[in-house]
UniProtKB/Swiss-Prot annotation:
Upper lineage: Bacteria, Pseudomonadati, Pseudomonadota, Gammaproteobacteria, Pasteurellales
Organism: Haemophilus influenzae (strain ATCC 51907 / DSM 11121 / KW20 / Rd)
Domain of life where this protein originates: Bacteria
Name of the protein this chain belongs to: Uncharacterized protein HI_0421
């Protein structure tokens, strides 16, 4: 699992995140932890999906 996280294409990920949600990018840079980052990002994506349906 850790190796998969390390091999993740971070530049593309951060480019997308910076467009989608700046607080998440800031949290990642400050190093609050990848699980927290993924959880926050997942919640944001779900929120966007629900907004589209409404």
């Amino acid at each position: 699992m850790a190796s998969a996280i390390r091999n993740f294409p971070y530049p593309c990920f951060w480019k997308f995140v910076s467009m989608a949600n700046r607080p998440i990018k800031t949290a990642g840079i400050l190093g609050y932890g990848t699980p927290l980052l993924i959880r926050s990002f997942g919640i944001s994506v779900i929120g966007i999906d629900n907004a589209d349906k409404v």
